[in-house]
Structures are given as structure tokens and as C-alpha cells.
A protein has these predicted regions:
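C-terminal regions of RecA-like/P-loop NTPase motor modules
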Residues: 1-2, 19, 33-43, 54-150
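Helical hairpin unit composed of two closely spaced alpha helices linked by a short loop
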Residues: 2-48
């Protein structure tokens, strides 16, 4: 049987019926809810990727927050867990290369927080930021982490 569903990405799904016309936000909300129902009916997790809006680009901290989910508050409401991936070097060319942050913004049955990681872009490989064999020091990484949930 099916153990997991991965959907890349929510805003590409079209759930409109032939005889109804929805606004974009209502359509995304309907799709989000339908996927939540599907997950419950099948008894399997669904990993649903979604775009974020550009609001974070106007803030000092570029780390995405729940309000940045694009086109629907229903995504935040329907999801059991919401995580964002942030790479400071995307916004700041002087930032340390290869360092990322996984922000657990919502976790229905657990704690939220941020987890630092390293990534190797040419290999599309992610590794533990605390691994001292990677570029950078543990002290630098620890200064990047807050409230690690795991």
C-alpha cells in the first residue's frame, strides 16, 4: 500500500469543479482541506510543498513565518506541521555559504524552533550543522540556533 504522499506544490493543483468559479485564495483553501481529508482517510502522511509570498523580503529577518504562506490562511490551519527552509546567503551575499536553517513554525503535537544545517549545493546534500568536519565552527552554528525541538 501507499505509505506517504508528496505533493510538489499546492499552488499548481486545480481543484475547481467545472461549474464553479472560485477566487484563488478560496481555491487554495479548498485544495488544502481536501488534502487534509485525504490524509486522514488513507491514514498516511502527506507532505505538501507550498510557495510563500514575498513579505519576508521586506522584513529585517528574512526567515519565513506562518503569515508568509502564499494565498491562504487555510494552509496554516489545516497543517499539523509547517516547516520553512531558509538560506541567508540567498538574501545576503556576505552570509556564510552552505548554512541553512529549518524553521519548525507549527507542530501540532510538539515544540517549534529552528535547526541549523549545512548543505552542499552541487551535491544537493544536507548534513548536520553541528558536524565539526564541515566548514565553520560549532560556536558559529550554535549562535544560529534557537529552541531546537529535537
Amino acid at each position: 500500500g501507499l505509505d506517504l504522499v508528496l505533493i510538489d506544490y499546492l499552488q499548481l493543483l486545480d481543484m475547481r469543479s467545472d461549474n464553479r468559479s472560485y477566487g484563488r485564495e478560496a481555491e487554495v483553501s479548498q485544495t488544502s482541506r481536501a488534502i487534509k481529508v485525504l490524509s486522514k482517510e488513507l491514514g498516511i502522511p502527506v507532505i505538501l510543498l507550498s510557495q510563500i509570498n514575498r513579505n519576508c523580503e521586506s522584513r529585517e529577518s528574512k526567515i519565513p513565518i506562518l503569515a508568509d504562506l502564499r494565498e491562504s490562511g487555510a494552509i496554516e490551519q489545516d497543517a499539523d506541521t509547517v516547516m520553512f527552509i531558509h538560506r541567508e546567503e540567498y538574501y545576503d551575499s556576505n552570509a556564510e555559504k552552505g548554512l541553512g536553517l529549518l524553521s519548525v513554525a507549527k507542530q501540532r503535537d510538539g515544540r517549534t524552533g529552528k535547526i541549523a544545517f549545512r548543505y552542499n549545493e552541487p551535491l544537493t546534500q544536507i548534513s548536520d550543522a553541528r558536524d565539526s568536519s564541515q566548514k565553520g565552527s560549532k560556536d558559529n552554528i550554535n549562535s544560529q540556533k534557537e529552541n531546537v525541538p529535537f
